[in-house]
Design a protein with these regions (language model features):
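Solvent-exposed, flexible loop/coil residues
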Residues: 54, 62, 67-70, 104, ...
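Left-handed beta-helix
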Residues: 96, 102, 107-108, 113-122, ...
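Intrinsic-disorder/low-complexity coil detector
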Residues: 17-18, 149, 186, 201, ...
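Terminal amphipathic alpha-helical/low-complexity segments used for targeting or macromolecular assembly
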Residues: 1-96, 206-220
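Conserved phosphate- and dinucleotide-binding cores of soluble alpha/beta proteins
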Residues: 145-149, 206
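Conserved beta-strand-loop-alpha-helix hinge in the C-terminal portion
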Residues: 190, 194-211
Length: 220
């Protein structure tokens, strides 16, 4: 199976639409639509079982969860918005099986394949182009009101059932194997598998994406 690498088109962030008939800028509306389509197209690129935007938009619980999270996260930062944000995230949890705390910071082109059983805590930070499978937990190891959840870099893949716990840092291009338990920092470009997770690096000259696909246990 060929590995797929996503590259962001940052032009949509610079696009500013002309004012509408009342002289109001439509930048926010266009930006939201562009982000919606970006999420949709990146999901299609990662899921060979889906053939169209319509099918993906209607049938992917992972996409539904991240779309609603983008709304609840904005509410979370507004005065008086925290309770509505929590209620919205709990409704999404009931409908999709994906629990993303509205305080979590999620980057662009994030995709949860299959969806069910994913938990992402309040202080988690997730970078761009992250792929996550079902049953993943980005959890805390403290009851204090501090940074207590993981920080995940860009272009990271986290396999089904993996647990990443505490304020650990997961570097860019890391691949975390299915059912692994990560409680320490993982350096960029590494592959982490096992309980507790041990770290290895792809062979010299080997693309880390190809290394991931060499062992199906890393991503199923």
């Amino acid at each position: 199976m060929a590995a797929f690498r996503l590259t962001g088109d940052t032009s949509i962030d610079r696009a500013v639409a002309p004012p509408d008939s009342r002289g109001r800028s439509t930048h926010l509306r266009v930006s939201a639509r562009a982000r919606f389509l970006e999420d949709l197209d990146s999901a299609i690129a990662r899921d060979p079982a889906v053939d169209s935007r319509l099918e993906m938009a209607l049938t992917s619980p992972g996409l539904h969860a991240i779309w609603v999270h983008r709304v609840s996260h904005r509410l979370w930062s507004m005065p008086g918005g925290r309770l509505p944000a929590r209620l919205l995230s709990q409704l999404t949890r009931a409908l999709t099986g994906v629990e993303i705390h509205p305080g979590a910071q999620i980057g662009r082109r994030f995709f949860i394949d299959h969806g069910m059983g994913v938990v992402i805590g309040e202080t988690a930070e997730v970078g761009d182009d992250v792929l996550m499978y079902h049953g993943v937990t980005l959890g805390g190891r403290s009851m204090e009101h501090v940074k207590r959840h993981p920080t995940v870099g860009n272009n990271v893949t986290i396999g089904a059932g993996a647990r990443v716990l505490g304020p650990v840092h997961i570097g860019d291009r890391v691949q975390i194997g299915a059912n692994s338990v990560v409680v320490k920092d993982i350096p960029a470009g590494a592959v982490a598998t096992g309980i507790p997770a041990t770290v290895r690096f792809p062979d010299r000259g080997e693309d880390p994406y190809e290394a991931m696909f060499r062992d199906p246990a890393l991503w199923i």
